[in-house]
């Protein structure tokens, strides 16, 4: 069963959002 394009887009968006959140959290803890 192939993955729908919408599911791929959602997965990429969640990964990007998680990455940005992790970077911001790391910078906040570093300061």
Curated annotation (Swiss-Prot):
Signal peptide: none annotated. The keyword Transmembrane applies. The chain crosses the membrane at residues 8-28. GO terms for biological process: photosynthesis. It comes from the Eukaryota. The keyword Transmembrane applies. It is a single-pass membrane protein. It is found in: Plastid, Chloroplast thylakoid membrane. Pfam families: PsaM (PF07465). One of its GO terms (cellular component) is photosystem I. Keywords: Chloroplast, Membrane, Photosynthesis, Photosystem I, Plastid, Thylakoid, Transmembrane, Transmembrane helix. Belongs to the PsaM family. HAMAP family: PSI_PsaM. This is Photosystem I reaction center subunit XII.
């Amino acid at each position: 069963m192939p993955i729908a394009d919408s599911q791929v887009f959602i997965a990429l968006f969640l990964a990007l959002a998680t990455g940005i959140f992790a970077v911001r959290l790391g910078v906040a803890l570093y300061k």
